[in-house]
Amino acid sequence: MKSIGCDIIKVERFKNFLENKKKMERFFTHKEIENFKLKGGSIIESLAGKFAAKESLIKALSPLLQYKINYTLKDIEVIKSLKGNAEFCLHNEVEKFAIKMNLKLYLTISHEKEYAIAFVIVEN
């Protein structure tokens, strides 16, 4: 194991995201936003969980960085794998760094009414 990252977020922080398109587009890719629209259940919990996942990855990568990389949270996309679990799809500088370092990323997300939590393990 190279590094870990964890983030916990209050779900209620994301209630106003649904009415604020600019906020949504600041943190989430168009693909993520479309998936939220198609998703049943609690969209707000899902938003919070994906945001926590992005923050967890940043925390996990930070100790590995030998140089500053430019990124936005939209460069870290959280998608559903063919198996149904959450995984990352990286873009731009974050993707280049992960490839250069030959990193393997493992993600788990959980949410329950008030809180969402994500945990990331980084290996190479």
UniProtKB/Swiss-Prot annotation:
Gene3D superfamilies documented for this protein: 4'-phosphopantetheinyl transferase domain
UniProt keyword Lipid biosynthesis present: yes
Protein residues bound to Mg(2+): 7, 55
Name of a matching Pfam family: ACPS
Top-rank taxon, per record: Bacteria
Entry's EC annotation: 2.7.8.7
Gene Ontology CC entries for this record: cytoplasm
Main location: cytoplasm
An example Gene Ontology biological process: fatty acid biosynthetic process
UniProt-annotated location(s): Cytoplasm
InterPro entries: 4-PPantetheinyl_Trfase_dom, 4-PPantetheinyl_Trfase_dom_sf, ACPS, Ppantetheine-prot_Trfase_dom
Keywords, in A-Z order: Cytoplasm, Fatty acid biosynthesis, Fatty acid metabolism, Lipid biosynthesis, Lipid metabolism, Magnesium, Metal-binding, Transferase
Chemical reaction(s) catalysed: apo-[ACP] + CoA = holo-[ACP] + adenosine 3',5'-bisphosphate + H(+)
Necessary cofactors: Mg(2+)
Keyword DNA-binding: no
GO molecular function terms attached to this record: holo-[acyl-carrier-protein] synthase activity; magnesium ion binding
Function of the molecule: Transfers the 4'-phosphopantetheine moiety from coenzyme A to a Ser of acyl-carrier-protein.
Membership in a protein family: Belongs to the P-Pant transferase superfamily. AcpS family.
HAMAP family per record: AcpS
Protein name: Holo-[acyl-carrier-protein] synthase
Gene: acpS
